[in-house]
Regions:
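Formylglycine-dependent sulfatase
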Residues: 2-9, 13-487, 491, 502-527
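Short hydrophobic beta-strand that contains or immediately precedes a catalytic carboxylate
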Residues: 495-496
């Protein structure tokens, strides 16, 4: 009998020990922000109002030289959330589904499930068209949160974005989405959305509460979820995905009122770089899908990828973007305040990231979708219990987030991950774990060259190596890094020296003064390709 009692007591103590171990693990608050470039106070922007993200920055490490793997939502999110590059995930577009290609791939939330965490999410975490059921159900140990109409203080937004009474009236009459195509045939919603100017205005400014729009609702529901998770016995991984400042730039009027239109900055350099190829730029088709923009540009869609947006319209769009950033910043503050109120702020790893940058007029571009600095550079802030706050200029990239969170939470870092843990950098901001970051983007050759290639398609993949001083981009024909590299695949190259040319005005890849530098960077890039080649 005594033995049975002793055994039972031992079992109870063992269970209690396991529960105590689990509860002692830090929680994780994982904040994704759609299309957020580093226009933040903590990144040196003197105009933007982001007090809450700046507050987070004072708690953690600000990675000043952080880059995405591919400057478009689906691929960059897939890479960050798996710790694998686009040529491994095979997500290089906005329609390939991650598990159709890699059914057994382990996502970051799945990893935390294996470590005894409860994982929960709301908002845009994965790109919805690149995963099953829009949010990858197996990544979440409890059902992914989806807002209902009753969660919005002003009813569901029209076309998922707008609260304008005029647009709501139009929508009710189906005047927007059932336009005729000239042949008496009604267009599908997708066809209507894909037309220039068919998606409604590029921005909205109305005097409404925060929870009239998606991000205010997401913050409100996330607070309730965090309170529920915190009361449980297990550590939690809570992912909150904010949709602004993605187009359309909608936000309540009070955030617009933080700024004066005349103070809004416009890009200093609004031309294509000398010696560059036309194909490497992007006509702002995403922007012109919204109304009220195209008529203010000098050029319609053209082979030269020119746009020429009027300065007043540029300032208006920048104003709208900044207001949307401040709106999202306020929601971040709500999450931080919730953790503080619950007494768990000091036991929570907090990571905030914008999935890529955004061209706000530089190089005559508006959007992402390139290998240039303004598209590939993205904010990353990580705060963790026991680590001092600071900033670092060390080169980092989004594939590093997965292994970093593994180590910070006390877990083992999977050996197969493409990234490296940034914990050494967080402990010593002068150190570095890598020499360069790598981005990539698919394109097609300039039209004059497409007819010269056998398949008539002219597909290219541009691999862009960003070191502390240089960006070296090599455009390769019908090539991805899981294939065997050969020099005859090279179509063209770009090289930019940020010490002398921070605005990327001149491609110096053929400049004899840079021959030695280009050769050294090329050697590094070829070594990278060799390391990624899949041996058959």
């Amino acid at each position: 009998m005594k033995k049975l009692i002793a055994a039972a007591l031992l079992g109870i103590l063992s269970i209690a020990h396991i529960i105590a171990q689990e509860k002692s693990k830090p929680n994780v608050l994982f904040i994704a922000v759609d299309d957020l470039k580093p226009v933040l106070g903590c990144y040196g922007d003197k105009i933007i109002k982001t007090p809450n993200i700046d507050r987070l920055a004072k708690m953690g490490t600000v990675f000043l030289n952080n880059y995405c793997q591919q400057a478009v939502c689906g691929p960059t999110r897939a890479s960050l959330l798996t710790g694998m590059r686009p040529d491994v995930t095979k997500i290089r577009d906005l329609h390939t589904k991650m598990r159709d290609i890699n059914p057994n791939i382990v996502t970051l939330p799945e990893y935390f499930i294996s470590q005894g965490y409860t994982t929960s999410g709301i908002g845009k975490i994965f790109h919805p068209s690149c995963v099953d059921k829009k949010f990858d159900p197996q990544s979440w140990s409890i059902p992914f949160l989806v807002a209902k109409e009753s969660d919005y203080s002003n009813g569901l937004p029209v076309q998922k974005h707008y609260q304008s009474p005029e647009l709501k009236a139009l929508n009710a009459k189906e005047e927007v989405l059932t336009a005729q195509d000239g042949k008496g045939k009604k267009k599908s919603k997708k066809e209507a959305d894909d037309e220039e100017g068919a998606r409604g205005p590029a921005f909205e400014c109305l005097d409404l509460p925060d929870d009239s729009y998606d991000d205010g609702v997401s913050a409100k529901l996330a607070v309730k979820q965090i309170e529920m998770l915190n009361a449980a016995k297990k550590p939690f991984f809570m992912a909150v995905g904010f949709r602004k400042p993605h187009l359309p730039f909608v936000s309540p009027k009070k955030y617009w009122d933080l700024y004066k239109r005349e103070d809004m900055p416009v890009a200093e350099f609004q031309e294509h770089a000398a010696n560059s190829k036309i194909f490497s730029y992007q006509y702002p088709g995403e922007l012109t899908n919204y109304s009220g923009v195209k008529e203010f540009a000098k050029f319609d869609k053209n082979e030269a990828n020119e746009f020429g947006l009027a300065i007043d319209k540029q300032k208006e769009l920048v104003h709208a973007y900044y207001a949307a950033v401040s709106y999202t910043d306020a929601q971040v503050g709500i999450l931080l305040n919730t953790l503080e109120k619950l007494g768990t702020l000091n036991n929570t790893i907090i990571v905030l990231w914008g999935d890529h940058g955004w061209h706000l007029g530089d190089h005559d571009m508006w959007g992402k979708h390139t290998n240039y600095e303004q598209a590939t550079k993205a904010p990353l802030i990580i705060a963790a219990p026991g680590l001092k706050a600071g900033q670092t200029k060390s080169m980092t990239e989004f594939v590093d987030v997965f292994p970093t969170l593994c180590e910070l939470s006390g877990g083992k870092v999977p050996a197969y991950l493409d990234g490296k843990s940034l914990v050494p950098v967080m402990k010593n901001n002068k150190t570095s774990v890598k020499e360069y970051a790598m981005s990539q983007y698919p394109r097609k050759m300039d039209k004059a060259d497409i007819n010269k290639v056998e398949d008539g398609k002219g597909k290219l993949m541009g691999y862009s190596m960003r070191t502390e001083q240089y960006r070296y981009t090599v455009w390769l024909k019908n090539f991805t890094s899981d294939q065997a590299y050969s020099a005859d695949k090279v179509y063209t190259k770009e090289l930019y020296d940020y010490d002398k040319d921070p605005l990327e005005k001149v491609n110096v890849s053929d400049d004899k003064k840079y021959a030695e530098i280009a050769a050294d960077l090329d050697k590094k890039l070829v070594a990278y390709f060799k390391s990624k080649e899949v041996k058959l």
